[in-house]
Amino acid sequence: MITEFIDGLQQFHFLQNALITAIAIGIVAGAVGCFIILRGMSLMGDAISHAVLPGVALSFILGINFFIGAIAFGLLASILITYIKSNSIIKSDTAMGYLSLPRPRSHSDRVAKSSTDLFHILFGNILAVQDQDMWVTIGVGVAVLLVIVLLFRPLLLTSFDPVLAQSMGVRVKLYHYLLMVLLTLVSVTAMQSVGTILIAAMLITPAATAYLYANSLWSMMLLSSGLGALASILGLFIGYSFNIAVGSCIVLTSAIFFLISFFIAPKQRKNKHALSPH
């Protein structure tokens, strides 16, 4: 089975594109997911994944690239969530839940009438990734990682202690919006591998697993990116070998990593002992 997969990589260009794209998305989603976890915004990935679907539908209606509509609606959703949180007594999780409600059936009907398979939009179809899509994913991934590296310190401060960051003159809201832009970019590019439904799991699960082991944000990001890439490789292998949805296999593999780590991670075991009455 492994030999067949390796032979397929050597023979089929589409499988090479799928592997490179899956690894790129796994790495960048793992890195961005760490900041989402630390900020307590795990629902944001799910909210944006719901928000981009009407953007995809509108793109098909207008006959433009779905990437444009998805990015526009994703950014609009992230801005609205932040605005509602900052200018009302409504908490961010409530705003995220509200913006996750936009009648998916009507948007799905519009997409279903297009030439694109609705199943591929909802659950991804990484085996159909073209050269242009692969290079766009790599370009977005490199840009996102570069921004994180260059602005690591302010992103770190605003994630752990926004009040302290504000007192130090750091523009907390600016970096929050920047992170939302990065999250939207990653969510839209991840549509090709896992689809809109499973984007949140791709963002959160590797980061949550890494959180159980890491003692610093750098180590958490590196481990999360590594786990995301490994889950992508194994998920692609399983999906290709057994002819099942690759996106679901990637997410399921990542979930297995988390479940195993939940029971064996040193930090988790220490926490259990701390909670024990004996």
UniProtKB/Swiss-Prot annotation:
Pfam families: ABC-3. The keyword Transmembrane applies. Keywords: Cell membrane, Membrane, Transmembrane, Transmembrane helix, Transport. It is found in: Cell membrane. The chain crosses the membrane at residues 18-38, 40-60, 61-81, 136-156, 172-192, 194-214, 220-240, 244-264. CDD domains: TM_ABC_iron-siderophores_like. GO terms for cellular component: ATP-binding cassette (ABC) transporter complex. One of its GO terms (biological process) is transmembrane transport. It is a multi-pass membrane protein. It comes from the Bacteria. InterPro entries: ABC_BtuC-like, ABC_TroCD. Part of an ABC transporter complex involved in manganese import. Belongs to the ABC-3 integral membrane protein family. This is Manganese import system permease protein ScaB. It comes from Streptococcus pneumoniae. The lineage of its organism: Bacteria, Bacillati, Bacillota, Bacilli, Lactobacillales.
